[in-house]
Amino acid sequence: MTITRHAQIDWDEHGNPRSRDFSDVYFSTESGLEETRHVFLVQNDLRRRFTELQDGGRLIIGETGFGTGLNFLCAWQLFDECAPANARLQFVSVEKYPLSHADLQRALALWPELSPFAGQLLDQYVAVHEGFQRLVFAGGRVTLTLLIGDALQMLPQLDGQMDAWFLDGFAPAKNPEMWTPELFAELARLSTSSTTIGTFTSTGWVRRSLNAAGFKMKRVPGIGHKWEVLRGTFIAWPEDVAHPPAAKPWLARPAPIGGERKALVIGAGLAGCATAQSLAQRGWQVSLLERHAAPAQEASGNPQGVLYLKLSAHGTALSQLILSGFGHTRRLLERLQRGVDWDACGVLQLTFDDKEALRQKQLADAFPESLLHLLDKPAAEAQSGVALNSGGLFYPEGGWVHPPALCHAQAAHANIRLIAHQQALELRRVDDQWQVWSEEQLVDSAPVVVLAGAADIQQFSQSADLPLKRIRGQITRLPQTQASTALRSVVCAEGYVAPARLGEHTLGASFDFNSTDLTPNLADHLDNLGLLREISEDLTSRLDTADLSPEQLQGRAAFRCTSPDYLPIVGPLADREAFMQAYAALGKDARQVPDITCPWLDGLYVNSGHGSRGLITAPLCGELIAAWLDNEPLPLPRSVAEACHPNRFALRGLIRGKGKQTVGH
């Protein structure tokens, strides 16, 4: 995979940025704000469109070339001025060479009138790496999805429809690789009959190429040193060009749920709380059902979890999900209390054998240093603060999180009602509503239900066939000592140990595929202490573990929930039996695509199977569920969303000839 690097920038005598890669300016040095507003806001008629948005309505803008974010900030400023209080702005922008935080801060300082919005962007502009990166502002009122990479690689992965386009980027003469018929075809694919477009260039071949792609473009007077600019509207896909292939029916979007915007989310762990918040921020009224007294009482209840990116150098779906999810979670954590709720202390993965050394070398070659880099033994010891057995791979933006803090913060939204001490046992579909029953008691009903209760969702007949499995894990809590305060980073080998939180270190974690007993046991505590010794004999000594009697060892056990392919299970659920009947032909020829609408269980969704990566993947998957339900652009590449789709297991069962057998068991 290609390493994404930051933009290379020179600054002129007036402090204006200029791209070294393209030998071009980011904006007019004379009238940058005026040009942005004229070319993109005026030509897309955004003042009127923002003003006329319905309460709860939204407008989605797509952009080529995020650059300094000037266009985004101007659009946000106008939206904030004109739109109804409950309207939403979604902005999707592709950028090959993102600015570093320092360069972005310096560039935006040129526009003091945008500072209220620029400050929020800078606060959230962390962990912006390759792929889809979701940034959320103003309590979800404004959403920015950055597609970090080449436009012709990123836009084909985007699943959504834009209301307006900002066709920006460096001038065609400076950046000819972007201004191509292939790009314009992607803009057309992502447009509807009411989509508008504005661009600063009035070059004839650009206008003709956009017309050929299905837009109707015209030249209009420019502003400043731009004599003319282009504006247009998408009319229709060209008759002489083959339509882009539609999504296979078992992966297509279900029809939108009309009527009451109410949802029930079952399970108040990381996945459930994230899903509830994502829906609540979009105006849904959410009932969050939890069988315990409070959120985060099971696997999400550990005192410290590690933000550790187990990546692949080969750009797998799981690796893409982890990279996007890590960035999203890191940005969420910026709003919590550092040092108590979380800490970006970095994560060091030790090189504990030759196989791990090779894996780390491949990762270091595949990703930028700002995400991960190799440290030799002396550097690793200097970074961690303790003596180690080896060097390793350091993730400077990683750290530890107190998962309950994140869950409670997300569940605190005013549109969320927590229903505690309530175990959901059965789902019934009655009059276009899902009813949740506990024994013979009707708990609540809504047109939408999201199952987020880890492997417990298998108790419902509608999701009983999902191949989820439990893996028991036990952590050990060790009291901080004066000597153990030297530990400055999370350190991992086969296990992990984190710097102290509120006077205790967390050490873990065991993996037990057979036990169903959640009582902490001495054997696993001793195994965890063995993992600690593999990490650092020095730290083991600093923690005075030799002086601890077995009865003093404290900890907790919980079940991780994972799937056979280690990807989470996220998306809409189908009727299993009807699915097998509808697509039975795939059992004879897997290349067939029967023209049969998927038999969805209308309004029933799942967000589960996050394993030990829940801190990284569950919050972004909450956004994915909300995007499915509200027909928004997906916050992940389409291929990644499809790789996480619940239907993948039934589909594999058909193709492998297993018929109605439960896949994965």
UniProtKB/Swiss-Prot annotation:
Catalytic reaction equation(s): 5-aminomethyl-2-thiouridine(34) in tRNA + S-adenosyl-L-methionine = 5-methylaminomethyl-2-thiouridine(34) in tRNA + S-adenosyl-L-homocysteine + H(+)
Residue numbers spanned by region tRNA (mnm(5)s(2)U34)-methyltransferase: 1-235
Ranges for region FAD-dependent cmnm(5)s(2)U34 oxidoreductase: 266-665
Gene Ontology BP term (one): tRNA wobble uridine modification
Listed cofactors: FAD
Family label: In the N-terminal section; belongs to the methyltransferase superfamily. tRNA (mnm(5)s(2)U34)-methyltransferase family. In the C-terminal section; belongs to the DAO family.
Function comment: Catalyzes the last two steps in the biosynthesis of 5-methylaminomethyl-2-thiouridine (mnm(5)s(2)U) at the wobble position (U34) in tRNA. Catalyzes the FAD-dependent demodification of cmnm(5)s(2)U34 to nm(5)s(2)U34, followed by the transfer of a methyl group from S-adenosyl-L-methionine to nm(5)s(2)U34, to form mnm(5)s(2)U34.
Name under which the protein is recorded: tRNA 5-methylaminomethyl-2-thiouridine biosynthesis bifunctional protein MnmC
Organism: Pseudomonas syringae pv. syringae (strain B728a)
Name of the coding gene: mnmC
